[in-house]
A protein has these predicted regions:
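Short, well-ordered, mixed-charge alpha-helical segments that flank or form enzyme active sites
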Residues: 1-2, 27-31, 68-71
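Claisen-condensing/thiolase-fold acyl-transfer catalytic domains that form or cleave C-C bonds
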Residues: 1-15, 109-184
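Flexible, glycine-rich active-site loops centered on histidine and acidic residues
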Residues: 14-43
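Short beta-strand segments
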Residues: 19-25, 51, 168-172
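General beta-strand structural signal in soluble alpha/beta enzymes
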Residues: 21, 62, 134-136
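Flexible, glycine-rich phosphate/dinucleotide-binding loops
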Residues: 28, 57, 69, 120, ...
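Condensing-enzyme catalytic core mediating Claisen C-C bond formation in acyl metabolism
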Residues: 33-95, 99, 161, 171, ...
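Short, well-ordered amphipathic alpha-helical segments that serve as non-catalytic structural scaffolds
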Residues: 92-105, 152-156
Length: 184
């Protein structure tokens, strides 16, 4: 989501017509194969997303970045391993992500959420209004980290193009939340 906001600004402020965003994460090399608390949550993934200027395309309707204090080391990539406090990450989703989505989601058709995994994704969906279309694909890919939203958009591209207003919401690593509202 942060890369998309940056690409949007570059295209609109610097007369660039196209920008390629590439994401890639290989968390498997940092996860202990015997750690059953983290191993099932993360997948390796990569994406390449071409952002192209169109006069009648989506326009920015608002954005927000929120960084949460990381003093408790709830999700940290240390030298050769990942440490995660699962309950603290779920707390982030419920106490920080949900209220921000509710503030930003007025009049949107669809919310494209980071695919954090079954538990967090289902909790978020249950806390948000049923009036939103909230597609998921964590069942197929797991948590693709920075590639989760690009892959989700690719899988739902026909529907994405039909939407009038959408909200993209990335959250997680570094305990941050980023929202980008787009509309036609």
């Amino acid at each position: 989501v942060d890369a998309l906001m940056l690409a949007y600004d570059i295209i609109n402020n610097n007369n660039k017509s196209k920008i390629l965003i590439v994401t890639s994460d290989t968390y498997s090399k940092f996860i202990n194969k015997n750690d059953r608390t983290i191993r099932p949550l993360f997948s390796d993934g990569a994406s390449a997303t071409l952002i192209k200027y169109k006069k009648k395309g989506f326009k920015s309707l608002g954005r927000k970045n929120l960084n949460i204090s990381n003093t408790q080391k709830d999700l940290i990539l240390e030298k050769d391993k990942i440490n995660m406090n699962g309950p603290a990450v779920v707390s982030l989703a419920l106490n920080e992500v949900v209220p921000e989505i509710k503030r930003f989601s007025k009049d949107v058709d669809t919310i494209y959420l980071h695919q954090a995994g079954k538990i967090v994704s289902n909790l978020l969906k249950s806390k948000l209004s049923n009036k939103f279309n909230i597609p998921t694909n964590f069942e197929k890919f797991g948590n693709l980290v920075s590639s989760s939203i690009p892959v989700l958009l690719f899988e739902n591209f026909k529907n994405f193009k039909k939407n009038k207003k959408v909200l993209l919401c990335g959250f997680g690593v570094g305990l941050s939340v980023s929202l980008f509202k787009l509309g036609k």
